[in-house]
Amino acid sequence: MLTLIKNADVYSPDHIGLKDILITDKRIAAIEDHIDITAPGLHVIDANGKIAVPGFIDSHVHILGGGGEGSYRTRTPELQLTDATLGGVTTLVGVIGTDGTTRTMPALIAKARALEEEGITCYVHTGSYQVPVKTLTGKIEDDLILIDRVIGAGEIAISDHRSSQPTAQELAKIASAARIGGMLSGKAGIVNIHVGDSHDHLSLIEVVVETTDIPIKQFYPTHINRNPHLFEAGIHYAKKGGYVDFTTSSIPKFLEEGEVKCSVALKRMLEAGVDVSQITFTSDGQASLPDFNADGELIGLQLGKVMSLYEAVREAVTDEGIDLAAAIRVITKNPAQILKLSSKGEIAVGKDADIVLLQQSDFSIDSVFAMGQVMVGNNQAVIKGTFE
């Protein structure tokens, strides 16, 4: 199948100007000022007045559903294909959260494969909040080495009343296993860390880094914008060389209580001197957004949305004045590099043909291509999930 996108203003994510993009099968075959070809079945798309950016990577999504903190009826539903594609997301990383009992690794991997059959790319992390880590094979290393979809471990919870209260030694052993498994499989072997509201912040990771040979970039902490004091701790952590991830799914009450809006968080991090390559956004899609009282009792619940991922990036551009090339990196090139997804995150020859076309006038999503296939056109789903 041949697709030719003509006259797009391309952000690779770096701005490279007006280009034609030729897609053959599932990859980008050429990017030139002008491509003029004829071939049977050639699909030509006029992207005049549109911006082409890499397909978005959402590396923290509860594809199986999450939640459950308010008992069984609060378990959230599985992700549907268009929950991702209508938001421009072409690559996902599935995680298990609080509930590592009824949400299992076999089910997580099966769901990832189902999403891939429907047209997008999906990886997973092994484990959940819990320590010891519940893996598929019995060992973190073995999951990474033997299971193609597994690229890291997590989300391991720290600084949270819902965590297993892991020690620095336990976290070090998890990171070591993930690192070795990653080395032997050619994967990132990253440890995705859920950071809660506790004033312990990122100290557990910092102790591991200070007392072992494990590098700070083995860890990928998320929810760093959840409150002002964690955000400030995140700035100091990032200045030591660590990655920081901001969660885009939110509700007004969280913002009123001090959560730092992602667009604002990005601007403040950059102003503080943190390199943009260390910063990512993820949606925490399909997670419950629980509100607890002072006694740790659940008093409210809403659902995280993958659609919020690009909405936050768009706000960073339109509301905070951040350059599109910098803003779009946090959901494209940065996660691709952190997770060692070498065929993702950039519009470049040889990369997977994951491309989003934006309206130049307002940065809204017009079209989405995943592995060369049109998933969204004119902001309408072209391909839907099996049960949608």
Q: What are these language model-derived features?
A:
Residues M1-T3, D9-V53:
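Histidine-rich, glycine-flanked metal-binding segment
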Residues A8, I21, K26, G49, ...:
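Divalent metal-coordination and catalytic microenvironments
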Residues I37, A47-A110:
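Metal-associated gating/positioning segment near the N- to mid-region
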Residues L79-T104, A110-P132, I147-H161, M183-D197, ...:
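Divalent metal-dependent hydrolysis catalytic cores, especially in the metallo-beta-lactamase
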Residues G67, S71-T74, L79-G94, D143-S164, ...:
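Active-site gating loops and adjacent loop-to-helix segments of metal-dependent hydrolytic enzymes
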Residues A8, D25-I28, I347-E388:
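C-terminal cap of metal-dependent C-N hydrolases
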Residues E271-L358:
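His/Asp/Glu-enriched, well-ordered alpha-helical/loop segment
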Residues A177-P290, L298-I299:
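Active-site core of metal-dependent hydrolases
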